[in-house]
Amino acid sequence: MAPPPPAPPSVTLRTVLLLLRVLTAAFLLITVVLISTNTVTLEISSTSIKLPFNDVYAYRYMLSAAVIGLVYAVVQLFLTISQFATGKTHPLTYQFDFYGDKVISYLLATGSAAGFGVSKDLKDTYIALIEFDSTDPVDKFFSKGYASASLLLFAFVSLAVLSVFSSLALSKRPVPVS
């Protein structure tokens, strides 16, 4: 006789998972808005040079990671709400959660690292070339880069916690009887 299937996650655990999914999506949405609106106009020798975020490759990568993560987070949010409402979980959901959480969390981590790295390097280079203070618009440009990278890092941490839960859920999933 086959062992009884494990009990579905408790309502409290489902609520925590739902809140983590919402938190991840919120962090990613704010990241996308911040980085996509990041632009600065440099005044060098009476010449104006507009520097939008997409002129910096690492910021483009960061935006791409955030958008991909946001799409995944929204899909997962709908799946989690569906599971929460019905109390039923499709057998393939365990694997989708497991692999998706792992891949997307690493994508978010690398996007965050790229954002931190390029913000520091470009700011240090700019400081070496031109003296500026905290009221300079260039400082605001780099501050938005740091803020976006920080939010992407928070989204990674949130998704990494979800990844632990999806690993546990996969190992305890009900095995279909043939």
UniProtKB/Swiss-Prot annotation:
Q: Which residues lie on this side of the membrane: Extracellular?
A: 36-60, 119-149
Organism equals Arabidopsis thaliana (Mouse-ear cress)
The domain of life is: Eukaryota
Q: Which family does it belong to?
A: Belongs to the Casparian strip membrane proteins (CASP) family.
The way this protein sits in the membrane is described as: Multi-pass membrane protein
| Pfam families given in the database record | CASP_dom (PF04535)
Lineage at the top is: Eukaryota, Viridiplantae, Streptophyta, Embryophyta, Tracheophyta
Keywords noted in UniProt: Acetylation, Cell membrane, Membrane, Transmembrane, Transmembrane helix
Q: Could you tell me what this protein is called?
A: CASP-like protein 4D1
Where is the protein situated, by its record's location annotation? Cell membrane
Tissue-level expression: Expressed in the root epidermis.
